[in-house]
Structures are given as structure tokens and as C-alpha cells.
């Protein structure tokens, strides 16, 4: 499918800017506002995904390495959504051009290297001007500031660990769901998507309790709050109704550096259909 070129017709007005570096986020955000753009800030990938769906901006600028969801996954989900897939995306990152080969789902339309803030901002403006003049089909003129950025071995190592982690999750049971401390879905296995009857892009960012039967929502919410408020690894079992299925689950807290950073739901089976008369 060829990318459409909305920017040739309509100038950029609203922008979602995503970066976990607070100083960069606020500085670039203010500079963009000084050019009369309507700027919405996201501090992590999950927040960026929510803003893109809620606002449907005319352009998105995002870092690659971010908490909760990396920029590559955000890009991939945008391109999977029929209502969002033509959104112009500018990657703004300290990664090198060679590092990007480790992110095959990073389907951005322009790439701007981080660096001295004034120069980086000018390059962002150039990338936006290029996209508005040439459309999404011409990426060559939208690669800016990478002449002196060197690849880093740690990026490849980080990606290997992420893939290994994803493979471990897929091996844990028929379906697995990783949550943040607010109970929102960060990662979900293909098996869990199939069991729940919804796609990954529909589920990422959703509160897991919203997928449960009404009678189980408060119980699961209380369970998650208990697990994520502790400083020790905890595990418990429950049976929860998702749609028409009753599914036995294990819920485990995820600890990092002595604090809970989220929870993992492991579906122990594909469940059984609830008797409507029961």
C-alpha cells in the first residue's frame, strides 16, 4: 500500500511529541508551541499511543527507546490502525542510522538525530517542511543530523533481551498479559488475543479489568492493587470471566530494583464457556 500524502493538502497543526527525557520533551514542546503548533506531550510509549488515538494528530514526533512501549511498537500499531496508518511520523532519537535496522517495525517517514537542542529543533522543522512538501513517499530528504552519530552495541544487546523476554512470555501459557502498575495492558501474547477475540492494537493500553465480567472487575482490581503495592514478589490464582469464557489465571507481580513495576497475568487454559443459565 502506498502511503497517502495528507500533508500536501493540509499543513500540520496538531502534534503528539513523545520522549521520556523530561527536559527534551518540555524544551522541544515549547519551541514547537512558539511556532503556533498545538502540541500534546507523552512521557512514555503507552501515553503516546493513547494520545494518538484520542487526538489523531496531523504529525507525530517520537523517541525510539521509551518506557512501557518503545517507539517501534507505537509505529507498528499506528500503521495497523486504518484510521491512523497515514499519520506522518518523525523519529527523534539518539540512535544511529545503523541502529534502526534492529527495529524492523519502525516505519517512520523522517528521522532526526538528537543533539544540540537548537540544531535538533531546526532539523525537526526541516523534516516537517519536507513531509508537507513531498509527502510520506519521499523519505530521502527527511533524514537529518546523522552524520556524526555512531552505532552502539548495547542497542543490539537490548533488542535481543526484549525478544527473549517476549518468547518467554509466549511460552508461559496459552495466553499471557503484561500490565503496568495501573492495570493497563503493555504486552499481550498472540494466544491471549485469540482467546479474547480482539487484536493487539485494540487491547494495548486498555485496563485489563474492562475486559472482565462486571462481577469480576472489582475483585481483579483489588487483587492487582494488592500485588503492585508490595515490595516482594507475589503470586496468586483466580478464575475470571472474560467475555463468554471463564479462565483460570495466575497473577504475578513484576519487581525491578526492589519496587513493583507491573504485573503478569498467565492464562492457565483457554477457559470454558459460561453456562448462560448458570
What residue spans do the PLM features occupy?
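Acidic catalytic/metal-coordinating carboxylates
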Residues: 43-47, 58, 70-76
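Alpha4 helix (beta4-alpha4-beta5 surface) of REC/receiver domains from two-component response regulators
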Residues: 73, 85, 95-127
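Receiver (REC) domain active-site loop signature in two-component systems and cognate sites
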Residues: 66
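Two-component/phosphorelay signaling modules centered on CheY-like receiver
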Residues: 21-43, 47
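Terminal output helix/cap of sensory domains in signal transduction proteins
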Residues: 212-243
Amino acid at each position: 500500500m502506498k502511503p497517502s500524502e495528507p500533508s500536501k493538502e493540509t499543513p500540520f497543526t496538531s502534534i503528539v511529541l513523545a520522549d521520556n527525557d523530561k527536559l527534551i520533551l518540555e524544551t522541544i514542546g515549547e519551541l514547537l508551541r512558539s511556532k503556533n503548533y498545538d502540541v500534546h506531550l507523552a512521557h512514555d510509549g503507552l501515553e503516546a499511543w493513547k494520545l494518538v488515538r484520542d487526538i489523531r494528530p496531523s504529525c507525530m514526533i517520537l523517541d525510539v527507546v521509551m518506557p512501557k512501549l518503545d517507539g517501534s511498537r507505537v509505529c507498528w500499531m499506528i500503521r495497523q490502525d486504518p484510521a491512523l496508518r497515514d499519520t506522518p511520523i518523525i523519529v527523534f532519537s539518539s540512535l544511529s542510522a545503523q541502529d534502526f535496522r534492529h527495529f524492523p517495525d519502525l516505519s517512520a517517514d523522517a528521522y532526526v538525530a538528537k543533539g544540540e537542542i537548537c540544531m535538533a529543533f531546526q532539523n525537526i522543522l526541516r523534516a516537517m517542511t519536507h513531509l508537507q512538501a513531498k509527502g510520506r513517499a519521499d523519505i530521502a530528504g527527511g533524514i537529518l543530523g546523522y552524520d556524526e552519530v555512531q552505532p552502539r552495541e548495547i542497542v543490539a544487546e537490548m533488542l535481543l533481551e526484549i525478544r527473549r523476554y517476549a518468547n518467554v512470555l509466549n511460552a508461559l501459557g496459552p495466553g499471557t498479559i503484561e500490565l503496568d502498575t495501573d492495570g493497563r495492558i503493555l504486552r499481550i501474547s498472540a494466544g491471549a488475543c485469540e482467546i479474547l477475540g480482539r487484536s493487539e492494537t485494540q487491547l494495548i493500553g486498555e485496563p485489563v479489568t474492562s475486559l472482565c465480567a462486571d462481577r469480576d472487575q472489582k475483585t481483579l482490581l483489588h487483587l492487582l492493587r494488592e500485588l503492585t503495592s508490595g515490595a516482594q514478589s507475589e503470586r496468586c490464582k483466580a478464575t475470571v470471566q472474560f467475555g463468554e469464557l471463564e479462565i483460570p489465571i495466575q497473577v504475578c507481580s513484576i519487581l525491578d530494583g526492589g519496587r513493583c513495576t507491573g504485573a503478569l497475568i498467565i492464562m492457565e487454559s483457554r477457559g470454558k464457556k459460561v453456562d448462560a443459565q448458570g
